[in-house]
Amino acid sequence: MMAAALGPPEVIAQLENAAKVLMAPPSMVSNEQRQHAEHIFLSFRKSKSPFAVCRHILETSKVDYVLFQAATAIMEAVVREWVLLEKGSIESLRTFLLTYVLQRPNLQKYVREQILLAVAVIVKRGSLDKSIDCKSIFHEVSQLISSGNPTVQTLACSILTALLSEFSSSSKTSNIGLSMEFHGNCKRVFQEEDLRQIFMLTVGVLQEFSRRENLSAQMSSVFQRYLALANQVLSWNFLPPKLGRHYIAMFESSQNVLLKPTESWREALLDSRVMELFFTVHRKIREDSDMAQDSLQCLAQLASLHGPIFPDEGSQVDYLAHFIEGLLNTINGIEIEDSEAVGISSIISNLITVFPRNVLTAIPSELFSSFVNCLTHLTCSFGRSAALEEVLDKDDMVYMEAYDKLLESWLTLVRDDKHFHKGFFTQHAVQVFNSYIQCHLAAPDGTRNLTANGVASREEEEISELQEDDRDQFSDQLASVGMLGRIAAEHCMPLLTSLLEERVTRLHGQLQRHQQQFLASPGSSTIDNKMLDDLYEDIHWLILVTGYLLADDTQGETPLIPPEIMEYSIKHSSEVDINTTLQILGSPGEKASSIPGYSRTDSVIRLLSAVLRVSEVESRAIRADLTHLLSPQMGKDIVWFLKRWAKTYLLVDEKLYDQISLPLSTAFGADTEGSQWIIGYLLQKVISNLSVWSSEQDLANDTVQLLVTLVERRERANLVIQCENWWNLAKQFASRSPPLNFLSSPVQRTLMKALVLGGFAHMDTETKQQYWTEVLQPLQQRFLRVINQENFQQMCQQEEVKQEITATLEALCGIAEATQIDNVAILFNFLMDFLNNCIGLMEVYKNTPETVNLIIEVFVEVAHKQICYLGESKAMHLYEACLTLLQVYSKNNLGRQRIDVTAEEEQYQDLLLIMELLTNLLSKEFIDFSDTDEVFRGHEPGQAAGRSVSAADVVLYGVNLILPLMSQDLLKFPTLCNQYYKLITFICEIFPEKIPQLPEDLFKSLMYSLELGMTSMSSEVCQLCLEALTPLAEQCAKAQETDSPLFLATRHFLKLVFDMLVLQKHNTEMTTAAGEAFYTLVCLHQAEYSELVETLLSSQQDPVIYQRLADAFNKLTASSTPPALDRKQKMAFLKSLEEFMANVGGLLCVK
């Protein structure tokens, strides 16, 4: 258009003026001028056959931005008009562009890159119909390389990089309006031949450079460019031969690409000289940190080589042996640079995880032994450097990252007992374990806080305040070190025991000295805490390692004593004196070594006893009023350890083990004095902590978690309730007396949960009645006393009244959290009385959001924990209560505007909680353990004959309430958005028959929400909406009402899903959900489906594509019978759809 109307000089003048406008500061030009300038460039790029004008621009214009746009116009027009262009003119255009760049070494980088990209696109488009191949380009590039001119060699590298980027993945390709299938096919063709050619050219350059002695700065820069190119080739994500476009997208999104080339690469990569070259290159440039990153990444990729490239196992063994030799030659005897640590650990990690273990063990044994020794040496060395980074509080923790990788590699090796005999890694494990302990202990035993020159580091306090808890931050490291400790239990357990016992003695001595000093001169406060701080930090790390060594983190599984620990205890049981062992366990106040025959104790029990001795010193210091000298961190470590230990060892269940250690079963088995004693001891610890440390929230929380562990298993709870302390704790908490009433809300909630769980231990009826009277009744009485006061309305905002109400609501949440199938009957009836009163509180506190939220949260917890056990009549009571709650909430929120878009998500906590409540009520339809009120036998059985309220009523009423409030602004909050869509999907799945009966406004809002979720939200939300469509379409098919709003809405959704599957890119995971919805919608709207297919086919200009699409659609619905809602037919359709997506999915999805 534009080019035809004006001559080249005028076009250039117009473009240069437009460029000036675009480059001008915002204050100098108006929006209209800017838009007009943009429009000029857009229409220029769309003009027909702009090649001559573009050549003229490139040769005459001096404005970089205009040159850039000319290159872009050429690239887009070549693809657009490909079929109309002569092969010769395409070839001359490509030659012109290359020559142009060659002759102008001073071009701006972004202009040069864009011109080379145009060349790459021409080559790519030509590769498909074989009209242009890369050979001529490679010939030209190899001539440029051999010129010896650094500028020209750099240009050659830029050409190869442009080709590589264009072909490498669909995410990096230019947006040139071609199908994803086309991009995938080009990549496959390219990776077989041309990619290898680029690699060989690159290897040639690297060989040439590695032979040279001295490189000028310019030559080094060229060397670096080619090394980066080699890295790009070796990090290529090789596409398997057949892969649909969705799978291509998923395949290419994987982060850590391992090297898996095709067979055609054997000669290039299995040639030992190639591997040697990369080791040589690294040795040459290792002191240049930027280049070292690339050379190590190349080696890490070569260390991950796998797949069809290896003809047999023998070739794999040879390759691996050769690689390990090269690696050892490179790193033995050198001081590793900081910039090499992560790269070297990646190489080792890849070798250990990618090569099968039988290949690893097949290399010469001496070589394997040297490799493991090297791994041991590096792990210890990186561990020391990582500890140093911690001390210096560095931002870039390279050694920590490298150390983590190596510890993971150890875990892979030591867990494999098929290929390595027992004890194979023991000595190495000892070295790594020792070095870890050494790095975490203060001098003189360890090197913690010593900088490289042996000087103590800056104050520890500054650092520890800023960081998350070590047990979370370093959990992976601790798990690996704990595992290595088990492998070498013979060494590690006695070591930990002696280190802990020795520090307990020193801590006891230090605290005594402080006490004497204080008694001698009460006013003096010249206490040097340095020694105490060092001791606390030592004990902190020793307890963490001990916890990870003795027990595993078990989530949702039955915790078992690790087999290595059990075997170790059994192996030495003949040398153990049980009575002495029990004496050491039962006298934590005495020094272990002062007990006669102390050396004949079980090592596992002795190690636990060492931690109990730490705990005892803490308790004695508290009794001696030295709490101010204690470390809350140590208190946390102790209860964390005791909880972890108790879950696994306390009342050990012999049925779970093939063989059991006699000392462990005697000390901690059922019906033993040892277990009764330790439960009493732990309970005392809990009570003491809650009194002394009530203001330390984390410590109090860890303490109540230990209490829950003691009562969550019935067998342990039976022992707990025999302790008088337990009853005292229950009474104290129920009376809300200090210091328990100072505990934070979450801690009080968990404490209530523990007290309720304890109440279901085995007791006679009278005792149980007495227990509930002391634990639950005071809660009820105090609550009723407060709310039934005549002037409650006036007093409700007083601080002590609000505190009482809050404490009661928190306690109710705790009671609900304690629900189990065998206690739900009692707890439900108890809680229902409260729920009705809570609704009244909603009125009183309607302007106090935090109280309103807490009231709703009580309902959320009750529904979440109990609904699945409730029979019909009980469930109805809960539904009625929830409905009343929603009605009150609705009345109080009428007309309340939520317009503050900048508000934080917390301000919408009430909406979130209501949605959670509705979702929990719906879950009854999925998970129902009730047996028509069977669990309530004897608890007012009550019939539901005159059912008045159903879950559907409550939930739809709730949705009616929520929908008008859920603006698009609110949906920007991810948690709100996900909870909202989860809820509406549930409703469509469970009550599809209720959807057509919704009021018109509500129905429209719901349909709009589904469309919004499918088109504008995350893939997770889109999937939920697709899952909602299937039941809605099925409902329509059942109702057979072709004029209903739902029928019309599903017709609209058919087009949306059709477009999504056929025309748009989307995640593979969604294909199944989309496919199911699509099938149901096609069954419902067969004529409309045929129309959509016809429209799509008639818009195709290319006869080949037309035919392929027509055949694919025919095959998709090939069945002679029309599609019907039949499971067998549906499954056949989904299978055909998968084939359809693989064959033509990429044809219409363009980029």
From Swiss-Prot:
Regions that span the bilayer: none
Chief place of localization: cytoplasm
Organism encoding this protein: Mus musculus (Mouse)
Keyword list, A-Z: Cytoplasm, Nucleus, Phosphoprotein, Protein transport, Transport
Known role: Mediates the nuclear export of proteins (cargos), such as EIF5A, SMAD3 and isoform M2 of PKM (PKM2). In the nucleus binds cooperatively to its cargo and to the GTPase Ran in its active GTP-bound form. Docking of this trimeric complex to the nuclear pore complex (NPC) is mediated through binding to nucleoporins. Upon transit of a nuclear export complex into the cytoplasm, disassembling of the complex and hydrolysis of Ran-GTP to Ran-GDP (induced by RANBP1 and RANGAP1, respectively) cause release of the cargo from the export receptor.
GO BP term (any one): protein transport
Residue(s) carrying Phosphoserine: 464, 521
Gene Ontology MF, one: nuclear export signal receptor activity
Entry-linked Pfam families: CRM1_C (PF08767)
Family the UniProt entry places it in: Belongs to the exportin family.
Subunit architecture: Interacts with Ran and cargo proteins in a GTP-dependent manner.
Localisation per UniProt entry: Cytoplasm; Nucleus
Gene field: Xpo4
The protein's name in its UniProt record: Exportin-4
Entry GO CC: cytoplasm; nucleus
